[in-house]
Regions:
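Active-site-proximal loop/turn and secondary-structure-junction residues that shape catalytic pockets
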Residues: 49-51, 76, 101-104, 141-143, ...
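Histidine-acidic metal/acid-base catalytic patches
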Residues: 2-44, 51-66, 131-133, 189-211, ...
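A short beta-strand-loop structural module common to alpha/beta enzyme folds
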Residues: 68-77
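Mid-chain, structured segments of secreted extracytoplasmic proteins
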Residues: 88-113
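Generic structural signal for hydrophobic
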Residues: 62, 88, 123, 127, ...
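Active-site-adjacent beta->alpha loops and helix N-cap segments on the catalytic face
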Residues: 78-87
Length: 301
């Protein structure tokens, strides 16, 4: 029965989140059509993906290729606030999401929970200081132990903990961003709709979620995944090739993102699509080609 209640509560997020971000027709009367505003494609690179030996060189590369977001890791972020703010000053690039970097995990049943609370809040505070949109987190990876059991009580506990963390993030001027993973990496939260439902039930504007083209392909359609969260909850997107998690385009025809991009355009998504991937070929050639591929598919979506 507990499992049934858990599933019902999670799946209801699809309808609730979508309705929250979808306009409702108030009448069938013909009205003048307003010109639809185009949704921009905002591209972002993780710091380790961009070309360059220093942060300045990486940002120079990004500016030269029209990339407007920088995703950095959360490890030692507190000590890098001044460096990052100085490097971004005067550029058309801003700090996007922060990629984890904390110790422990939120569903731990031992001292790892305290480690999470301390380090996560430190990263969240630093994220606000560099103008980041949020800190990415996964409630629990496969293999992390001891972990709370997969029950409705655990889900309720998670929502309570996220409410507190989300409210703290808001005070810091940022958010926390839940990332669903595929079943090989995470037993707990695999669907964007699951994450959106947890955002809803956490009852804090400081709790958001994201989608990752790599993880989503194993669980649901890209279009359905993004639409299940809507603009109310969707804050960030990751992208990689769809065969080996390399640069978009390195897996050939498999690397088709147009279905998900169509959802992002229809909902008016304003966040970044960030490269989280490896690279097999010459990065100086492959990375610009990957950026061009995403721009082409965005136009076609």
């Amino acid at each position: 029965m507990k499992r049934r209640n858990f599933i019902i509560s999670s799946l209801s997020g699809i309808a609730a989140a979508s309705v929250a971000s979808t306009p409702i027709l108030s009448s069938c009367c013909t009205a003048p059509k307003e010109k639809k505003q185009e949704t921009p494609l905002n591209l972002c690179l993780q710091e380790g993906v961009a070309l360059g030996d220093s942060l300045e060189e990486k940002l120079d590369f990004m500016e030269a290729h029209g990339v407007t977001g920088l995703e950095v890791g959360g490890g030692n972020l507190k000590s890098r606030v001044e460096e990052i703010n100085k490097a971004l000053q005067g550029r058309n690039i801003k700090a996007s999401a922060i990629c984890a970097g904390f110790s422990g995990f939120i569903l731990a049943e031992d001292e790892q929970k305290q480690q999470f609370d301390t380090t996560m809040r430190e990263i969240v505070e630093a994220a606000g200081q560099i103008g980041s949109c949020g800190v990415i987190m996964v409630p629990a990876f496969n293999g992390q132990n001891p972990c709370k059991p997969h029950t409705m009580d655990t889900r309720n506990y998670l929502c309570e903990q996220l409410h507190e963390l989300g409210e703290f993030a808001l005070k810091c001027g940022t958010t926390v961003i839940l990332e669903p993973l595929n079943r090989r990496e995470c037993f707990y939260m695999r669907l964007v709709s699951d994450a959106a439902a947890i955002c809803r039930d956490s009852d804090s504007e400081g709790v958001k979620c994201m989608g990752d083209f790599w993880h989503m392909q194993e669980e649901t359609s890209d279009y359905a995944a993004f639409m299940s969260a809507g603009t109310k909850y969707l804050r960030h997107v990751h992208v990689a090739s769809r065969g080996r998690r390399l640069m978009p385009g390195e897996d050939g025809e498999k690397d088709d993102y147009r279905d998900g991009m169509r959802a992002l355009k229809e909902m008016g998504y304003q966040g970044h699509i960030s490269f989280e991937c490896g690279c097999e070929g010459d990065r100086a050639t492959v990375l610009p080609a990957a950026l061009d591929l995403l721009r082409k598919q965005w136009e076609e979506a």
